[in-house]
Regions:
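Transmembrane alpha-helices and adjacent helix-loop boundaries
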Residues: 2-187
Length: 187
């Protein structure tokens, strides 16, 4: 029963991280982003593919974040200049495109069969019985760090500008700030 509860907690903590990102996009910036899961998939597959090639897990996780950010930047540059409705459509299309590529390109991801043999985090350091517990504790720490980071971002000058963009984009433009630039950074 304990292993089951830890597995459920791991899933909850992963979804909490996704919710923090959506909170920053929609709650503070006012961006309707349906592509969030596409960025998550890019990061997950990047980490998995690099780990399978023997890259250490922490390095592959950092590369995953970098690849997801690299995918978000050009998408944001294009879609955010059009308007919020177009952002929703473009990010939905992006997310669906990522899903289709991951499912059909068997040479890269093995398609619907998935990627077997991905090295587990903490596999060499902890006993098989406690690996999931360590993953859960790491995710708790990452969630706490992400929550603190979002809190600091929102209280910063950047955070005040993105909230102003959400509330009145015309006023932000009148004050000499480029709303598209701040939306892209938020994405």
């Amino acid at each position: 029963m304990e292993a089951y509860l830890i597995a459920i907690a791991i899933g909850i903590l992963i979804y909490m991280l996704l919710a923090f990102g959506l909170s920053l996009h929609y709650g503070f910036t006012g961006l309707i982003n349906f592509g969030h899961v596409g960025f998550f998939a890019i990061g997950a597959y990047t980490s998995a593919l690099l780990s399978l090639k023997g890259v250490p897990v922490p390095v592959s996780m950092a590369a995953a974040a970098a690849f997801a950010a690299l995918a978000a930047y050009p998408l944001g540059m294009i879609a955010l200049r059009l308007g919020s409705d177009y952002l929703a459509i473009v990010t939905l299309g992006f997310s669906e495109s990522v899903r289709m590529v991951l499912q059909t390109e068997e040479w890269l991801t093995r398609g619907m069969h998935g990627l077997p043999g991905i090295p587990r985090l903490f596999a060499g350091w902890a006993s098989p019985q406690t690996v999931d517990l360590w993953i859960m504790l790491l995710l708790l720490a990452v969630n706490a760090g992400a929550l603190l980071l979002i809190h600091l971002v929102i209280r910063s000058p950047f955070g005040r500008v993105i909230e102003a963009v959400r509330d009145n984009e015309v006023a932000v433009r009148a004050l000499g700030k480029d709303p598209a630039k701040f939306k892209t950074r938020s994405l």
